[in-house]
Amino acid sequence: MIIWMTGCTNGLGRALVPEFVERGHTVVGCGRNEIELQRLSEEFPDCFFMACDVSDEGSVEDFVNEALISAGEPDFLINNAAIVNEPAPLWQVSAEEFNSLTSVNINGVANMIRHVVPLMLSNDSGMVINLSSGWGRSSSPDVAPYCATKWAIEGLNQALSQELPENVGTVALNPGVINTEMLQKCWGEEADSFPSAESWATTAAPFILGLTPKDNGKPLTAP
């Protein structure tokens, strides 16, 4: 299968790449860290990696066009790219930082869907995986902007599921609590007590690959 994934240069996305490849799939990935993208290209020469800012629709359009030429149409789209705010009460979060989160975490998902789902509709086949969060189903102090964006993804996913035909599906996937740079930013050393992204990916990858349009609309949590 051909798996398109955003945010592949670090965290959960970076950890999923080798797991998918080892299972015989082609990864088409994007991110903003060009050094890591080059490393990925060298490590996985049969895959395709390209710089892309998902919050910029023009950048997304360029990525989609190049990916189609280099790798082919997607069986899966994994909307993984996301950022978190510096922990602070909402009234101390600047408008610039708040807008940055919504641009990446919400607009970025919508931009990818806008350009990729029509390909799936044409093929009458495909799965969209929108990475959510436990903070998209609950809340916590000092991360209100992040919570807001992930609650938005849950609603977006539910509405999208009602718009798709029978053979195309979408799910909102809560990865669980994983020791990534984002969690360290929020929790500091406490994050070290949780599983690494690499450990998580060994069970998350087969779980994701097992999702089908029969799961359409479900709010799921990775094992």
Task: Annotate each predicted stretch with a short phrase.
Residues 9-10:
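Conserved glycine-rich cofactor-binding loop
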Residues 23-39:
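Conserved glycine-rich Rossmann-like NAD(P)H-binding loop of the short-chain dehydrogenase/reductase
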Residues 51-62, 95:
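The beta1-alpha1 cofactor-binding region of Rossmann-like NAD(H)/NADP(H)-dependent oxidoreductases
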Residues 88-90, 97-99:
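Substrate-binding pocket helix/loop in short-chain dehydrogenase/reductase
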Residues 113, 149:
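Active-site helix of classical SDR
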Residues 133:
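Residue(s) in the substrate-gating loop at a strand-loop-helix junction
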Residues 166-168, 172-173, 180, 189-223:
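C-terminal helical subdomain
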